[in-house]
């Protein structure tokens, strides 16, 4: 692309408040593994959205400082606010990862992934499978919020596993009770993957 688009002015769209972070315009590039890397975020930034979330970063290898994960978690010098999506199935590692990211001043916003429908993630009990276990979901969210301090934490989740196991209302309530700054609903089930229509009435 060869043009810059000016962000919307304050009078055009009301900003989105995520704790102390003000997103203006209130347009968010959703995180997606293998897609929302730095070059892609840089291209999208030219079109004027307010928040660009990184691709999914796994908590444990981040805590263990594995090179590949550290590179994925890097931001460009021109990126502000720095928004990272974190994935984990163990509250301990999630808490440690958040504490490290915040303590090292690496992020301005953390989004927790509870919506990934990919089988290699869900068969390990992660992503969209976590809200099926509300106590685990609560403990992971609590660990993230506790260690984030003033950095806003949001959560992203789906309607549920399939039409017979819908978990989104409970997931949203747990997020609210544990102090997240916002919740994001992908209004499809994990079984739908990225096919079919979103159920806007659920949103």
PLM regions: where:
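Flavin-dependent oxidoreductase catalytic cores
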Residues: 1-203
């Amino acid at each position: 692309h060869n043009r810059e688009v000016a962000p919307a002015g304050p009078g055009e769209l009301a900003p989105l408040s995520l704790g102390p972070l003000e997103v203006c315009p209130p347009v968010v590039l959703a995180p997606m593994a293998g897609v929302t890397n730095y070059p892609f975020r840089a291209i999208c930034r030219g079109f004027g959205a307010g928040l660009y979330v990184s691709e999914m970063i796994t908590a444990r290898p981040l805590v263990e400082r594995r090179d590949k994960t550290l590179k994925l978690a890097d931001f460009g010098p021109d990126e502000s606010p720095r928004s990272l999506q974190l994935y984990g199935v163990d509250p301990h590692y999630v808490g440690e990862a958040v504490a490290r990211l915040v303590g090292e001043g690496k992020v301005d916003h953390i989004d927790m992934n509870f919506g990934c429908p990919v089988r290699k993630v869900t068969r390990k009990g992660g992503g969209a499978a976590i809200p099926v276990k509300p106590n685990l979901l609560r403990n992971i969210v609590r660990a993230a919020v506790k260690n984030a301090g003033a950095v806003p934490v949001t959560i992203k989740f789906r309607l549920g596993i399939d039409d017979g196991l819908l978990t989104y209302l409970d997931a949203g309530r747990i997020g609210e009770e544990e102090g997240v700054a916002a919740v994001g609903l992908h209004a499809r089930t994990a079984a739908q993957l990225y096919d079919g229509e979103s159920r806007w009435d659920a949103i």
